[in-house]
């Protein structure tokens, strides 16, 4: 009988302990709300643009902001994942729509044509970036604490933000194009610059890299360029597949390493003003 009572009490204690753990887990989940990813319509040059604002769950007034310039196919799952990740870290993030409402490319051919237009008309690209920066600030970001990042075509845009002299503290290019028209003069580059580049990226010829380095030196920029071995173009984009022979492919090691360099850059650029940054990518 005594054994039965002891066994019953043990089972009751185990059930009670499990219930307490479950209640604690539910409480923790409720106390850690997820950031919001909200569609935002803004305009530039009479064109409606449909971006996304990622708002931290516990948003602080005038938190640092990060503008995300997507790759040539426009806003995709990858850019949304990055925005959400940054919002979890406490940043206000905004994904720019460069092409505009009704102009989302359906094929790589269309994407190449649209991206090519903005590369050939950098002043128009810069205006679209400026409009997105304004939308980021309106979403709650500190106008004096902003970093612009971009992927592929967007990486080119991040450098254009630096060339335009926008009020941003830093720019980061993930596997982006580095060149500009030879007729454009090299000017002062005020923001910090970080270029994260695949060592085997055939889309960016050495001549373009040399020109970029000269531009940075002529502009007296505070710049860094990091090469990742075995990585080709689009190394952060899982949708690119894993076949390096195609010239664009995902590389998990380069993806994780580039994210670590990026978060270190944020810590340095924002001077530790905000959040405990996490270098581990989800």
Feature map (PLM): residue ranges:
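Serine-hydrolase catalytic machinery in alpha/beta-hydrolase-like enzymes
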Residues: 26-33, 38-139, 237-249
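Short alpha-helix in the alpha/beta-hydrolase fold that links the catalytic acid
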Residues: 82, 205-216
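Gly/Ala-rich beta-loop-alpha elbow adjacent to hydrolase catalytic centers
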Residues: 150-154, 158
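A conserved short beta-strand
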Residues: 167-177
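Short beta-strand/loop motif that positions the catalytic acidic residue
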Residues: 195-197
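C-terminal catalytic histidine-bearing segment of alpha/beta-hydrolase fold enzymes
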Residues: 222-282
């Amino acid at each position: 009988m005594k054994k039965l009572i002891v066994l019953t009490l043990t089972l009751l204690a185990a059930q009670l302990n499990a219930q307490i753990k479950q209640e604690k887990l539910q409480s923790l989940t409720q106390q850690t709300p997820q950031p919001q990813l909200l569609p935002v319509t803004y305009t530039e040059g009479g064109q409606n643009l449909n971006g996304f604002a990622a708002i931290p769950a516990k948003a602080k007034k005038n938190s640092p902001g990060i503008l995300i310039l997507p790759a040539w196919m426009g806003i995709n799952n990858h850019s949304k994942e990055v925005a959400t990740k940054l919002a979890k870290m406490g940043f206000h993030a905004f994904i720019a729509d460069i092409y505009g409402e009704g102009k989302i490319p359906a094929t790589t051919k269309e994407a190449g044509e649209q991206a090519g237009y903005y590369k050939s008309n950098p002043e128009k690209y810069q205006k679209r970036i400026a409009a997105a920066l304004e939308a980021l600030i309106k979403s709650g970001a500190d106008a004096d604490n902003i970093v612009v990042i971009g992927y592929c075509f967007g990486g080119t845009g991040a450098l254009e933000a630096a060339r335009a002299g926008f009020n941003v503290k830093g720019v980061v290019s993930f596997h982006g194009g580095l060149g500009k028209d030879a007729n454009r003069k090299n000017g002062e580059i005020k923001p910090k610059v970080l270029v994260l580049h695949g060592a085997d990226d055939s889309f960016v010829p050495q001549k373009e890299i040399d020109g970029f380095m000269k531009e940075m030196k002529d502009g007296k920029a505070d710049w860094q360029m990091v090469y990742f071995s075995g990585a080709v173009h689009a190394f952060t984009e899982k949708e690119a597949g894993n076949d390096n022979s195609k010239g664009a492919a995902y590389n998990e090691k380069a993806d994780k390493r580039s994210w670590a360099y990026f978060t270190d850059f944020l810590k340095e650029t924002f001077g530790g003003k905000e959040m405990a940054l996490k270098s581990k990518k989800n």
